[in-house]
Amino acid sequence: MIQIVFDSKTGNVQRFVDKTPFRNKRKVSTEEYLDEPFVLITYTTGFGEVPKTTEMFLEKNAHLLLGVAASGNRVWGDNFAKSAEKISKQYQVPILGKFELSGTAKDVELFTQEVERVVTKSSAKMDPVKQ
């Protein structure tokens, strides 16, 4: 089962993660090296920036990153959930969702569908029999 790794400052991302059906969840650790693929959910800080803790985690683990989602607040306009865009561009992974604060039931549903899609696609790439 896919790992969901998350970074939460105010608890919004934690609440979003708690609403997902995924069981293998862990909070970002700047010291941790992972050994299996994961999906990242983070928040956006400042003026559309990626949190430092997320950056430090990705320095060690980005090679296993399958996709990213981010929270934000729509009052920030173009900077809404901008961290997802920055991580997607830097690490060439898909954006699996953007949600406001702790997200809605629809946000969770769409994120879950995107995770399942990216995991299926990733599994097919790793299994030459499926190609």
From Swiss-Prot:
UniProt cross-references to Pfam families, sorted A to Z: Flavodoxin_NdrI (PF07972)
GO term, biological process aspect, one: protein modification process
Domain of life: Bacteria
Molecular function per GO: FMN binding
Span of the signal peptide: none
Purpose of the protein: Probably involved in ribonucleotide reductase function.
Family: Belongs to the NrdI family.
Protein known as: Protein NrdI
Source organism per UniProt: Bacillus licheniformis (strain ATCC 14580 / DSM 13 / JCM 2505 / CCUG 7422 / NBRC 12200 / NCIMB 9375 / NCTC 10341 / NRRL NRS-1264 / Gibson 46)
